[in-house]
C-alpha cells in the first residue's frame, strides 16, 4: 500500500494559497473511483482506491504529522509520499527526494518528529520572492502564476503517477524541472501590461483619427 499525502491548511481562507499546493495536487489525483474513508481518528480527508491512499490532513500545517501518523499506524503502508510547497525553489520547479532535512517547512517538521524522515517527498517550488516567509506562503498566487499553475499541476500529477510505479531516482531524472525565477515572472507580467497598454493606445489613436475624418467630412 502507498500513502500519498498533500500538505496544506483547511478552511476557505487558505484555499488556493501557496502553502496549499499539496492539497491542490491531491485534488488533481482524485478521481471518481476513489472512495472516501470518513473517520475522525485520521484527522484528515482520506481516500482509497485499491492499494493507493490519498490524504489531506485537516490539522493545520504545523500539526500535519498527527494525521499522517494516525493513517500510518492504522494502514501501515509500504511507502509514504508527501507533496508540499518549497519556498527555496523557483516557482513551478519540481524536485524529488527521500529523507533529508525539513528545510524549515513546518509540515515536514511535524511529520519527521512523529514518524521519522524515511519517506519520499515531492517538492513544488513557489518561489521566495520578497517579504516575510510566512506572508508569502499564506498568500494567493498572482495572475501570472495562476496562468502557469494548471500546467505545473498537470506535470506534477504525471510525476506522482509515475513515482507510484517507479523509484524516486528515475522519477527525479524524468520530471525534475527548474521553474521560473520571480523576476522573470515579474518581467512577463510587466510585458503583458505594456502590450495591453500599447494596444489600448493604438485603439485610442485609431478612434481619434476616425473622429477627425468624420468631422472633416461633415464640414465639407
Curated annotation (Swiss-Prot):
Site feature location: Discriminates between blocked and unblocked aminoacyl-tRNA: 9
This protein's record includes keyword RNA-binding: yes
Superkingdom field: Bacteria
Keyword entries, A-Z: Cytoplasm, Hydrolase, RNA-binding, tRNA-binding
Chain positions recorded as tRNA binding sites: 14, 60, 62, 106
Sections of the chain in a coiled coil: none
Entry annotated with the keyword Cell inner membrane: no
Catalysed reaction equations from the record: an N-acyl-L-alpha-aminoacyl-tRNA + H2O = an N-acyl-L-amino acid + a tRNA + H(+)
Annotated signal sequence range: none
Subcellular location: Cytoplasm
The EC number(s) this enzyme carries: 3.1.1.29
Subunit text: Monomer.
Stated family: Belongs to the PTH family.
Name this polypeptide is given: Peptidyl-tRNA hydrolase
Lineage per the UniProt record: Bacteria, Pseudomonadati, Campylobacterota, Epsilonproteobacteria, Campylobacterales
Gene that encodes the chain: pth
Amino acid at each position: 500500500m502507498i500513502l500519498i499525502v498533500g500538505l496544506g491548511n483547511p478552511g476557505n481562507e487558505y484555499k488556493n494559497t501557496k502553502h496549499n499546493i499539496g492539497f491542490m495536487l491531491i485534488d488533481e489525483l482524485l478521481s471518481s473511483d476513489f472512495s472516501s474513508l470518513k473517520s475522525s481518528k485520521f484527522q484528515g480527508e482520506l481516500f482509497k482506491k485499491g492499494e493507493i491512499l490519498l490524504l489531506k490532513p485537516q490539522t493545520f500545517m504545523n500539526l500535519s504529522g498527527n494525521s499522517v501518523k494516525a493513517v500510518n499506524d492504522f494502514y501501515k503502508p509500504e511507502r509514504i509520499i508527501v507533496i508540499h510547497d518549497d519556498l527555496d525553489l523557483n516557482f513551478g520547479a519540481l524536485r524529488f527526494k527521500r529523507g533529508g532535512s525539513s528545510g524549515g517547512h513546518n509540515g515536514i517538521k511535524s511529520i519527521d518528529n512523529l514518524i521519522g524522515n524515511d519517506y519520499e517527498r515531492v517538492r513544488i517550488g513557489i518561489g521566495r520572492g520578497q517579504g516575510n516567509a510566512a506572508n508569502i506562503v499564506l498568500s494567493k498566487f498572482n495572475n501570472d502564476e495562476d496562468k502557469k499553475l494548471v500546467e505545473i499541476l498537470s506535470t506534477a500529477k504525471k510525476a506522482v503517477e509515475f513515482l507510484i510505479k517507479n523509484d524516486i531516482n528515475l522519477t527525479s531524472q524524468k520530471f525534475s524541472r527548474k521553474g521560473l525565477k520571480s523576476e522573470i515572472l515579474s518581467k512577463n507580467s510587466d510585458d503583458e501590461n505594456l502590450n495591453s497598454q500599447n494596444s489600448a493606445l493604438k485603439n485610442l489613436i485609431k478612434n481619434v483619427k476616425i473622429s477627425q475624418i468624420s468631422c472633416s467630412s461633415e464640414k465639407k
